[in-house]
C-alpha cells in the first residue's frame, strides 16, 4: 500500500468577524476566518425577523379572486 496518501488532519482555529473563535479539526492549513458564526447568526441567537407570510397569502388570494370573478362575468 502507498504511504502518506491522506492529508494531515490537524487542529485549526476558526475566527469569526464578531470576535468569537473556536477550535476544530480540518485538512486546511492555518487559521480559518469567517464572516458569521453560530454566536452572531440571527437564526442561532433568536433575533431573526419573521416575515408576515399570512398577509402576503391573503393579498394573493384577493388578487386572484377578483380575476376569477371577472373571468366568470365574460
Curated annotation (Swiss-Prot):
Identification of the protein by name: Large ribosomal subunit protein bL31
Family: Belongs to the bacterial ribosomal protein bL31 family. Type A subfamily.
Binding residue positions for Zn(2+): 16, 18, 37, 40
Gene3D superfamilies, A to Z: Ribosomal protein L31
HAMAP family found in the cross-reference section: Ribosomal_bL31_1 (MF_00501)
Entry-linked Pfam families: Ribosomal_L31 (PF01197)
NCBIfam families, A to Z: L31, PRK00019.1
Range of residues in the leader sequence: none
Entry function: Binds the 23S rRNA.
Listed GO biological process terms: translation
Entry's cofactor comment: Binds 1 zinc ion per subunit.
Subunit description: Part of the 50S ribosomal subunit.
Alphabetical list of PROSITE patterns matching this protein: RIBOSOMAL_L31
Coiled coil feature spans: none
Domain of life: Bacteria
Amino acid at each position: 500500500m502507498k504511504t502518506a496518501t491522506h492529508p494531515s488532519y490537524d487542529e485549526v482555529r476558526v475566527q469569526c468577524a464578531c470576535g468569537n473563535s473556536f477550535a476544530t479539526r480540518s485538512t486546511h492549513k492555518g487559521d480559518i476566518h469567517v464572516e458569521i458564526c453560530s454566536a452572531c447568526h440571527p437564526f442561532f441567537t433568536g433575533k431573526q425577523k419573521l416575515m408576515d407570510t399570512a398577509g402576503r397569502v391573503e393579498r394573493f388570494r384577493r388578487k386572484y379572486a377578483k380575476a376569477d370573478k371577472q373571468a366568470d362575468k365574460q
